[in-house]
């Protein structure tokens, strides 16, 4: 349906627009990724509030991560996370073999160096969602071969 | 019809407190503050099965001689506390639940407002209107 394409196109335009503005201005390129991530953070906070409105209380951290992998990912990207790994000590790796924001770009190694820009927003999304549920974390992403990508979540114990 | 409604952030500071007979406001603030302890107790009662662990609605927190206090915790650890007049016995559990549902829906709408920073006090007029509709009419 057209509504899937809407978010993909808006997101690509967001990334392109931010980098265009950075080129014209004086700012360094590193700030664009931070801006994208903080945008994703705020969106993630609001989204999580809406999605967890009707779900039951979460038992523990693993429960929350499973919710993110299944319900949250399905609602935003229309599919689930393909693989969740953890070392049970606060590190989770979410693997998506066909990340929707990257499928339109390439199916191998082409454009690999541009991929991180398109993952920043989603990293922020995960971090914002977790923070609203009471978990402080650091989320990073890596791509070895499009369109598969891995999100690594490191829980910060205060 | 509630007498006082409070929204408390996960760090336990108030985001929104409104009470109807405005001269005794401090007493209601104190009541809400002490009810936070009871809320924490109920949430952390793991394995005791006193409260259904999967539900967001906590039920009656504690009754005083004039008032009854009800609680509700969202998944993002934001607490809603409602103080109801004891003399108003017509209020059933279902009505209280539906009032908390409305509160939760309005709070979700506020979160999605781009002009609202999570953690700030709530100044939304739509939220005020909704809370007014739930408070007792004092003439």
Curated annotation (Swiss-Prot), chain B:
Q: Does the keyword RNA-binding apply?
A: no
Q: Which Gene3D superfamilies match?
A: 3.30.450.70
Q: Provide this UniProt record's keywords sorted from A to Z.
A: Cytoplasm, Endoplasmic reticulum, ER-Golgi transport, Golgi apparatus, Transport
Main localization, broad class: cytoplasm
The protein's matches in Pfam families, at most eight in alphabetical order, are given as: Sedlin_N
Which is a Gene Ontology cellular component entry for this protein? Golgi apparatus
Question: Is Endoplasmic reticulum among the key words of this record?
Answer: yes
Q: Which GO terms describe its biological process?
A: endoplasmic reticulum to Golgi vesicle-mediated transport
Family the entry assigns: Belongs to the TRAPP small subunits family. Sedlin subfamily.
Question: What is the purpose of this protein?
Answer: May play a role in vesicular transport from endoplasmic reticulum to Golgi.
Task: Tell me what this protein is called.
Answer: Trafficking protein particle complex subunit 2-like protein
Q: Which organism is it from?
A: Taeniopygia guttata (Zebra finch)
Query: What lineage is this protein's organism placed in?
Result: Eukaryota, Metazoa, Chordata, Craniata, Vertebrata
């Amino acid at each position: 349906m057209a509504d899937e394409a809407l978010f993909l196109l808006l997101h690509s335009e967001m990334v392109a627009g931010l980098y265009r503005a950075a080129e014209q201005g004086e700012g360094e390129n590193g700030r664009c990724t931070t801006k994208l991530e903080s945008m994703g953070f705020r969106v993630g906070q609001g989204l999580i509030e809406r999605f967890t409105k009707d779900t039951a209380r979460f038992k523990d951290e693993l429960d929350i991560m499973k919710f993110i992998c299944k319900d949250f990912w399905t609602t935003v990207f229309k599919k689930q996370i393909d693989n969740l790994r953890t070392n049970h000590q606060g590190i989770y790796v979410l693997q998506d073999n066909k990340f929707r924001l990257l499928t339109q770009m390439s199916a191998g190694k082409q454009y690999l160096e541009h991929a991180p820009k398109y993952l920043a927003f989603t990293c922020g999304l995960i971090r914002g969602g977790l923070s609203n549920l009471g978990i402080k974390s650091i989320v990073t992403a890596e791509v070895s071969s499009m369109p598969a990508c891995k999100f690594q979540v490191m829980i910060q114990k205060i | 019809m509630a007498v006082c409604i409070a929204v408390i952030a996960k760090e336990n500071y108030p985001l929104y407190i409104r009470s109807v007979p405005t001269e005794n406001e401090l007493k209601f603030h104190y009541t809400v503050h002490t009810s936070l302890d009871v809320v924490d107790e109920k949430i952390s009662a793991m394995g005791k099965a006193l409260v259904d662990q999967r539900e967001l609605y906590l039920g009656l927190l504690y009754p005083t001689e004039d008032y009854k206090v009800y609680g509700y915790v969202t998944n993002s650890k934001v607490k809603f506390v409602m103080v109801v007049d004891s003399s108003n016995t017509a209020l059933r559990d279902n009505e209280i639940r539906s009032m908390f549902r409305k509160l939760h829906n309005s709070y979700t709408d506020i979160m999605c407002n781009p002009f609202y920073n999570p953690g700030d006090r709530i100044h939304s007029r739509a939220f005020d209107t909704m809370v007014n509709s739930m408070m007792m009419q004092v003439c």
